[in-house]
C-alpha cells in the first residue's frame, strides 16, 4: 500500500478524528462493537474497540487480506486507552530472510515466547491513556537474529480506545512531535 510512497518522519494509518478513520482498515466484530465515541478524559473523538472475546473483535490494516502495508519505518506508535480489560495487538513484519514474522503483545500474558513465525510477549499498560512505542527493528533482531525490512500488517484487538496509530523513523520527544500527534489531556482546574 505504501511501498511506493516516500517514507520519512511520520506515517499515520489511523487518526480517530479524521473524516473516515477506518478507511484503509477492515473490521471484524462478534459479541462487541467498534464505534467512534467522545472520551471524557481528553474530550475528543476516539475509536473504541470492545468485545467479550479479544480474538473475535478487531480492526486490521490493510483492509484487503491480499495487500500489505509496505511501511519501512521501524517504530510503531499507538496512542491507546487502557480499559482495564484484556487487550492485544499484532504486527506482521518481513525480515531480510524473506520470512513473515508476527509479534503479538497482550496485557494478559506473563512470559515471552518466541516461535519460528510468531513472538508473543506481555505488555503492561498504565491507567488511562498510553503511548505504546514498538521498535520493530530491535524486536526482529532480538527475537530472530534477522533484520527488519518492512511492516506488512497491523491488527488491533479488543479492548481499547484508539486515538492514533502511526509509524516513525525514530523515537521523537514530546517537544519534537507535530501538534496533531500529541495527546492533549485537558488541564484540571484545582478549585479550593
Swiss-Prot record:
Keyword terms, alphabetized: Cell projection, Cilium, Cytoplasm, Cytoskeleton, Microtubule, Nucleus
Signal peptide bounds: none
Naturally occurring in which organism (per UniProt): Danio rerio
Effect of inactivating the gene: Display curved body axis, short somite length and defective heart-looping orientation.
InterPro entries named in the record: CFA20/CFAP20DC (IPR040441), CFA20_dom (IPR007714)
Subcellular location: Nucleus; Cytoplasm, Cytoskeleton, Microtubule organizing center, Centrosome, Centriole; Cytoplasm, Cytoskeleton, Cilium basal body; Cytoplasm, Cytoskeleton, Cilium axoneme
PANTHER family: ORF PROTEIN
Name of protein: Cilia- and flagella-associated protein 20
Sequence intervals crossing the membrane: none
Similarity annotation: Belongs to the CFAP20 family.
Function: Cilium- and flagellum-specific protein that plays a role in axonemal structure organization and motility. Microtubule inner protein (MIP) part of the dynein-decorated doublet microtubules (DMTs) in cilia axoneme, which is required for motile cilia beating. Involved in the regulation of the size and morphology of cilia. Required for axonemal microtubules polyglutamylation. Plays a role in cilia stability.
Top-level taxonomic group: Eukaryota
Disulfide bond annotation, renumbered to this chain: none
GO cellular component: axonemal microtubule; centriole; ciliary basal body; cilium; motile cilium; nucleus
GO biological process: cilium assembly; determination of heart left/right asymmetry; notochord morphogenesis; positive regulation of cell motility; positive regulation of feeding behavior; protein polyglutamylation; regulation of cilium beat frequency involved in ciliary motility; regulation of heart looping
Amino acid at each position: 500500500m505504501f511501498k511506493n510512497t516516500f517514507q520519512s518522519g511520520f506515517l499515520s494509518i489511523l487518526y480517530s478524528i479524521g473524516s473516515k478513520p477506518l478507511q484503509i482498515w477492515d473490521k471484524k466484530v462478534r459479541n462487541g462493537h467498534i464505534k467512534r465515541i467522545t472520551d471524557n478524559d481528553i474530550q475528543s473523538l476516539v475509536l473504541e474497540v470492545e468485545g467479550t472475546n479479544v480474538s473475535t473483535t478487531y480492526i486490521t490494516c490493510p483492509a484487503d487480506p491480499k495487500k500489505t502495508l509496505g511501511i519501512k519505518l521501524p517504530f510503531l506508535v499507538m496512542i491507546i486507552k487502557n480499559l482495564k480489560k484484556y487487550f492485544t495487538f499484532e504486527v506482521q513484519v518481513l525480515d531480510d530472510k524473506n520470512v513473515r514474522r508476527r509479534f503479538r503483545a497482550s496485557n494478559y500474558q506473563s512470559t515471552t515466547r518466541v516461535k519460528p513465525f510468531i513472538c508473543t510477549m506481555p505488555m503492561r499498560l498504565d491507567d488511562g491513556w498510553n503511548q505504546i512505542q514498538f521498535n520493530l527493528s530491535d524486536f526482529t533482531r532480538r527475537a530472530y537474529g534477522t533484520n527488519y525490512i518492512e511492516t506488512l500488517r497491523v491488527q488491533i484487538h479488543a479492548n481499547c480506545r484508539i486515538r492514533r496509530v502511526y509509524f516513525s523513523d525514530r523515537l521523537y520527544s514530546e517537544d519534537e512531535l507535530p501538534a496533531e500527534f500529541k495527546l492533549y489531556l485537558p488541564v484540571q482546574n484545582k478549585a479550593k
